[in-house]
Amino acid sequence: GCIKGATWFSFDPKSNFDHLYMTASGVGSCRLIDLEQKTVTMLPDLGNKTERPTIINWTVDENQDMIVSRDLSNNGAVNIVLSRASGFKTKTLLEDSQHKQKGVTGAFVHPKTGTLYYTLYETQPMWRYDFATKEFTTFASHMRTKETLRMVVHPTGKYAYLLRLYSSQQNSYIARMDYNEVLDKFSEPYIIAGHASKAGYVDGVGGNARVNGPGQGVFVKNEDYTGAEDEYDFYFTDEYNHCIRILTPTGRVTTFAGRGNGSTEGGYADGALRTEARFFHPWAIAYDEKRKCFYVGERGEKHDGTKQAVIRKIAQEE
């Protein structure tokens, strides 16, 4: 089938890495990619084009219901819960009656507490929703208004990354928020890679590195780090550099795949990760722990997702 506008990937935690959900914000319906049956199914119940379902998370209770965060253009319930028991058809709106909200661009669920954290495009304060108390509160602020931020929490819940996918000022960075278990609170974000006022393509450490449109990322265990305080590398899409990068626990950014044959332009090319492979505006990425491979979702020739695009697989040759 035709794939357009891949925005975000999320594995169903009860599917043993067989069911991969994909959003296509602003372009079309969400999809279920069944990796076991090798089928793709349109899912209009998860939201339509105007509702712009963008991020998918899961509750941490025994039900592990689906949470869809929406980039609404008008005020409304920016987060909804779809029950697993209903086949993800029955919706519960998480709407804050005290504050008008629209335009979620990033969200995650803390793996230990189950609290939902999210950020809005037009305002700086970031929000949290407590499922137990049903309370909405702010907890920190990001750098500027009108920046599209993706959010990814570490598997341990000890910290989370903010990835600036878009800003009208054309700058890109990855920031980090540290979690205080005693206070049940995240710190204010601080930049660990890239620059708040610059964008580009440079492998390096911390502020010396340059990125240009970091989007979704995924933590993957590195066997070389066994026994270390942090055993995970962070793989992330870099849209305008048309590649996949790695951020190590020490803050070093390297290029994992893309920009084959020395090209700085986007394109479609399979082959060796660094010498041949090329991508076109990658936004989504997921790691399949069962099959030991990555899936990369691209926006295609036009980053708005209106052109036909593809989902690529990165795996060791058999």
Which residues fall in each region the model found?
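Loop/turn-rich, solvent-exposed surfaces of beta-rich toroidal or solenoidal domains
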Residues: Q216-V220, D224, E229-T248
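Blade-level signature of beta-propeller repeat domains, shared across WD40, Kelch, NHL, RCC1
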Residues: H281-E318
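A short loop-to-beta-strand structural motif that recurs across blades of beta-propeller domains
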Residues: G28-R31, G76-V81, Q124-W127, S172-A175, ...
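Residue-level detector of Asp-centered blade-edge/turn motifs that repeat once per structural unit
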Residues: F11-F17, V60-N63, V109-T113, V153-G157, ...
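An edge-strand/N-cap motif at the start of beta-rich repeat modules
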Residues: G1-L35
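Gly/Pro-rich loop segments of beta-rich domains
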Residues: G1-T7, G26, Q37-I55, D71-N74, ...
